[in-house]
Amino acid sequence: MGKEKIHINIVVIGHVDSGKSTTTGHLIYKCGGIDKRTIEKFEKEAQEMGKGSFKYAWVLDKLKAERERGITIDIALWKFETSKYYVTIIDAPGHRDFIKNMITGTSQADCAVLIVAAGTGEFEAGISKNGQTREHALLAFTLGVKQLIVGVNKMDSTEPPYSEARYEEIKKEVSSYIKKIGYNPASVAFVPISGWHGDNMLEPSEKMPWFKGWSVERKEGKAEGKCLIDALDAILPPQRPTDKPLRLPLQDVYKIGGIGTVPVGRVETGLLKPGMVVNFAPVNLVTEVKSVEMHHEALTEAMPGDNVGFNVKNVSVKELRRGYVAGDSKNNPPRGAADFTAQVIVLNHPGQIANGYTPVLDCHTAHIACKFSEIKEKCDRRTGKTTETEPKAIKSGDAAIIVLVPSKPLCVESFQEFPPLGRFAVRDMRQTVAVGVIKSVNFKETTSGKVTKAAEKAQKKK
């Protein structure tokens, strides 16, 4: 077997008809986890429904429909391999809760792949003020996805087909607007592709002899290649934050007969080990971890990215809930927030937002109403420079520095220190109206919570 490939996560973004599904479907289809039988079944169904021309997107639609219905489909279907990486597509837009998912995201994307359509009029629609292209790219950047690849899709439908001039025009335009957002175009690979015909997807296309390949420059060195798959191979591997203090937001808490209370969640930073004395914030409950397991196998330690269940002693299911955060009681344990200051970007709110506005925040696994207690300043989104102090109200398109006060105990962190616990979605009227990145947290004075007997024993042993 040799050494296992590194796992990376990508998010595919772009306007609704840019061909994201077809492009993603093509990669999964050609390099992915879908077995031949499933593909043949999909193809047959597609043909019967007269959707023969739609097979790659059809593959994705089938998967998406299953995901929408809440069937946890075989996650392998959303994976594909490059020569260097195992790639997981963590969410493809078009999904209703895409923006929320991207923020509270089960995992941080290492790279965003932006698909823009080259067809006449199509590119312009996607990039116009109300197209989704800008919003998606802005979100990716705001949420710390610093690597970007741009696929200029549907090159087969330009006038004339596979037009170099059209590609160059789009490249120039996209470069200028991703630069406004904060990306450096020199470090972004641009590839002209056809997700449907397969041009420049996995191998260089004869139809675009003018394309000499993409190249990027970044402080980690240069990279170059011919097709989309090479660009994915050139993604810089993520640094998994094992050296930071433990943060594990709880997704669920189970009571398992004969074992006891088992909280479940994903290690975001640090390590979780059996025997560790953990602290659950914001309730400040301290207890010992008896065992840790993943996929029904006992672990000696769980690392960032691992979804685990762990058994805790002398704690009832009622004392823990989704949204609480576990940490190591001996190493900068998590605490509840009295209030926190964040940079908030308003995406789509029909009216004005003023002090006192109290929407629901989705931050990691927590879902809690928070009050905008003080809108301190409006700022330039890209540079962070103040443009107005103490504004009366803010509206769609504005970025502002705001002090928020949670209505119930809540555990959050600054984005700088613990990214997954420092970004949030603001939900109102069943949609994401704003996104935020936490600059600083004013922690509550820790009043000591319950310390279980198991924890006391474990602490004495040490």
Swiss-Prot record:
Coiled coil: none annotated. Pfam families: GTP-eEF1A_C (PF22594), GTP_EFTU (PF00009), GTP_EFTU_D2 (PF03144). Its main location: cytoplasm. Residues 194-196 are annotated as: G5. Keywords: Cytoplasm, Elongation factor, GTP-binding, Nucleotide-binding, Phosphoprotein, Protein biosynthesis. GO terms for molecular function: GTP binding; GTPase activity; translation elongation factor activity. Residues 5-242 form the tr-type G domain. GO terms for cellular component: eukaryotic translation elongation factor 1 complex. GTP binds at residues 14-21, 91-95, 153-156. This is Elongation factor 1-alpha 2. The modification 5-glutamyl glycerylphosphorylethanolamine is found at E301, E374. PANTHER family: TRANSLATION FACTOR (PTHR23115). Residues 70-74 are annotated as: G2. SUPFAM superfamilies: EF-Tu/eEF-1alpha/eIF2-gamma C-terminal domain (SSF50465), P-loop containing nucleoside triphosphate hydrolases (SSF52540), Translation proteins (SSF50447). InterPro entries: EFTu-like_2, G_TR_CS, GTP-eEF1A_C, P-loop_NTPase, T_Tr_GTP-bd_dom, TRAFAC_GTPase_members, Transl_B-barrel_sf, Transl_elong_EF1A/Init_IF2_C. It is found in: Cytoplasm. The lineage of its organism: Eukaryota, Metazoa, Ecdysozoa, Arthropoda, Hexapoda. Residues 14-21 are annotated as: G1. It comes from Drosophila melanogaster (Fruit fly). Disulfide bonds: none annotated. Belongs to the TRAFAC class translation factor GTPase superfamily. Classic translation factor GTPase family. EF-Tu/EF-1A subfamily. This protein promotes the GTP-dependent binding of aminoacyl-tRNA to the A-site of ribosomes during protein biosynthesis. One of its GO terms (biological process) is translation.
